[in-house]
């Protein structure tokens, strides 16, 4: 059945982050990390930008710290692929009328499905009418664009992200790039951000946090399973 319009508006926000994942993934420093010289920040951000432009699937963990107007998502978990077709699935905790709501979601065949009631799937119509879930992997509007517009890069140290050593780099992201990937921020000037880039392999983007210093809010996304297959089953609508 088709979901009510007020629920569609709610999931317009949920779908903007359809590319995300489950438990809040943090980072930790440890003595097992390399103690060698830190790499050049600008070079590594450029390498991560080039790699991210070609990523077609990923597992993401998203967490929102604080309250952001128009963004009732607290945590979101899921997998996304844009090749050969765009599909996504996951789970989110959202705040509705002051209460936390846990919902599963699926995007398949261009349709957005979700469970606002446990085990009861509803069809929210065309995902593209609510939000283009593929945008986070869009090289012109997603994470690659954020990295391409990352300025003032400075290496800060090393942390462990999902058990992998990553170099922590601080800088700023242009307002336009922020608003493309996180419209509720309504950025009017560059925003402080921190990226964690894997120290081994292809130097994949392992984590990013965008901070709104004026409000004290932030959005953090942690990535893994780059370019691994994603399988999604179309749910049975109640």
UniProtKB/Swiss-Prot annotation:
Compartments, record wording: Cell inner membrane; Secreted, Cell wall; Secreted
Gene3D superfamilies: 2.50.20.20
Record's comment on post-translational modification: Modified by Lgt on Cys-27 with an S-linked diacylglyceral, signal peptide is removed by LspA, Cys-27 is further modifed with a fatty acid on its amino group by Lnt yielding a triacylated protein. Probably glycosylated, which is required for T-cell activation.
Positions where lipid (S-diacylglycerol cysteine) attaches: 27
A single BP term in Gene Ontology: lipid transport
Signal peptide (residue range): 1-26
Keyword Cell cycle: no
Keyword Membrane on entry: yes
GO molecular-function terms, A-Z: lipid binding
Pfam families to which the protein is assigned, alphabetical: LppX_LprAFG
GO cellular component: extracellular region; plasma membrane
Membrane topology value: Lipid-anchor
Domain of life per record: Bacteria
Xref: InterPro entries: LolA/LolB/LppX, LppX/LprAFG
Keyword annotations from UniProtKB, A to Z: Cell inner membrane, Cell membrane, Cell wall, Glycoprotein, Lipid transport, Lipid-binding, Lipoprotein, Membrane, Palmitate, Secreted, Signal, Transport
Chain residues carrying a lipid of type N-palmitoyl cysteine: 27
Stretches assigned to coiled coil: none
Function: Helps membrane protein ML0556 (P55) transport triacylglycerides (TAG) across the inner cell membrane into the periplasm and probably ultimately to the outer membrane. Binds TAG in its hydrophobic cavity and transfers it between lipid bilayers. TAG probably regulates lipid metabolism and growth regulation and plays a structural role in the outer membrane. Binds di- and triacylated phosphatidyl-myo-inositol mannosides (PIMs), and glycolipid lipoglycan modulins lipoarabinomannan (LAM) and lipomannan (LM), facilitating their recognition by TLR2.
Misc remark: Bacterial LAM blocks host cell phagosome-lysosome fusion and is one way in which Mycobacteria evade the host immune system.
Stated family: Belongs to the LppX/LprAFG lipoprotein family.
Name of this chain's protein: Lipoarabinomannan carrier protein LprG
